[in-house]
Structure formats: C-alpha cells, structure tokens
Amino acid sequence: MLLAIDAGNTNIVFALVDGGAIVARWRIATDARRTADEYAVWLHQLLQLEGHDRSVIEAVIIATVVPRALHNLEVLASKYFGVEALVAGRPPVEWGITLDVDEPQNVGADRAVNVIAAHKRHPGDLILIDFGTATTFDVVDYSGAYKGGIIAPGINLSLDALVAAAAKLPRIAIEAPETSTVIGRTTQDQMLIGIYFGYVAMIEGLVARMKAEIGRPATVIATGGLATLFERHVKLFDSIEPDLTIQGLGIMYDRLKTGP
C-alpha cells in the first residue's frame, strides 16, 4: 500500500491508499519538533488497530507546506518503512500540470496536488476552495491549468485574532449555527454569527466574482479539514471532497509508476 502524507500548518494527515482507494486515515497536530521515532510509534499503534503491519507500506509520498517537518517525515519513510519518500513537486514527482501564474515556484504543494485530483475527477473549469489554516480559492481551467486564486485567513485564525485583540471577548467554539439568523442575542452568539456568516458572505461573494471573471460555468469544489463546517449554509458547492489532497497524492504516485 501507499502511505500518503499531507503535512499542513495545523495538522498532518496520514492515509493508507490501495488501488486509488483510501483504506484508512489518521490526523495528528503539526509539530516540526516531532521526531521520526515519535511518528513511527504513533503510526505503529494505529496500523495495528486497523489490523495492518507496517510491512504493508510499500511506498511513501509527501506533500508539505511546512518545510521544517519534511526531514523527519523522510527519515520515517527510510528508517521504518525502508523506502525513499517521494516528495510532491520534487523530481521525479513532477506536477504534470501547467502552473499558469507569475510565480509558479511559490504555489503551495497542497494546492497543486488538489488541482491534479480535481481535474481528473471533474472535467471543465473549476473553483477549488480549501478550508484549513488558510482558506484558499484556486481556479483551474478546462485544460487542467492552474490559473491563480486567492489566499485568505482561515476561520480559526480570524477567531484567534479577534479574541487576542479584544480583551473581554471569550473564546468560543466555531460550529455551524442551527438557524440562518444574523441578529445575535448574546455576546457568544454575536461572535459566532460574525465569524461564521462573515465567512459565508466572503465565500459567496468571492465565488461570484471569480465566476464572473472566468466567464464560463465553473464547478465549485470544497475540500480541507473544515469544508463540512460550511455545508449547511453555503449552497453553491457542487461537491465536498475532504480528501482531495490525499487523492491527488495517490494519482501522482500511480502516474509515476505507470507513466502519464
């Protein structure tokens, strides 16, 4: 099986992929100080819970936006699985897509991998929205070329900034409100409405502007760890695919094995 690793700013997702299907997935908080040995102990226990031995892992592929975490993940692959980790965007794991932007070298690995997965699954023009530490909007044309996008603070970052700057505001949990009312009657309700429905308005407004700029119908795909948070109140998503990055890593690995 393939061990696909998506190392983000907040969490690292490890997934077992077999024949394109995700067999198991686990999530751990990102900590660049965590050693290969610590990852190995954690993974060994989870593999056992799923009824697997570490010998089932035949290859490892990594996409990361946290450079300091990469070394120990590579050591994990070599020391405990006996393989050299493949790293998305680093030879021989080329993107296989056109990054049609002014600074292609600065496109995040997770965003490029998402483009690969989404284009294979959905022909035509696409808008990808990845809800994570940052909220990113990416435009992909019908040929599969990445045309650019938007980077905004993630919803939890916005809450953190608000609470840090306003001494009397309490820490609240971000969740989808039960109703669509935007007139809160308590401080906590008003904060949740402001953060949550402010994000809903941002999503709807930016997608409308992007569609107008594209000038053609575009499929809107939501992904990332927080994508389902907006499912109740955002009606413009054509598809919610939380595992898009892992699926993209699987596609890249298969392409490397079999050729384009």
Swiss-Prot record:
Sites where the protein binds ATP: D6, A7, G8, N9, T10, N11, I12, V13, T133
CDD domains on file: ASKHA_NBD_PanK-III (cd24015)
Annotated binding of K(+), by residue: D130
EC main group: transferase
Pathway info: Cofactor biosynthesis; coenzyme A biosynthesis; CoA from (R)-pantothenate: step 1/5
Cofactor binding mode and count: A monovalent cation. Ammonium or potassium.
A cellular-component GO term for this protein: cytoplasm
Broad class of the protein's primary localization: cytoplasm
Entries under Gene3D superfamilies matching the protein: 3.30.420.40
Positions annotated as active site in the UniProt record: D110
GO-annotated molecular function: ATP binding; metal ion binding; pantothenate kinase activity
Swiss-Prot/TrEMBL keywords: ATP-binding, Coenzyme A biosynthesis, Cytoplasm, Kinase, Metal-binding, Nucleotide-binding, Potassium, Transferase
Cofactor(s), by name: NH4(+); K(+)
Alphabetical GO biological process terms: coenzyme A biosynthetic process
E.C. designation(s): 2.7.1.33
Domain of life assignment: Bacteria
Catalytic reactions of this protein: (R)-pantothenate + ATP = (R)-4'-phosphopantothenate + ADP + H(+)
Residue pairs linked by disulfide bridges in the UniProt entry: none
Subcellular localization(s) per the UniProt record: Cytoplasm
InterPro entries hit by this protein: ATPase_NBD, Type_III_PanK
UniProt function note: Catalyzes the phosphorylation of pantothenate (Pan), the first step in CoA biosynthesis.
Subunit structure, as described in the record: Homodimer.
Family under the similarity heading: Belongs to the type III pantothenate kinase family.
NCBIfam families per UniProt: baf, PRK13318.1-2, PRK13318.1-6, PRK13321.1
Protein name, per record: Type III pantothenate kinase
Organismal lineage: Bacteria, Pseudomonadati, Pseudomonadota, Alphaproteobacteria, Sphingomonadales
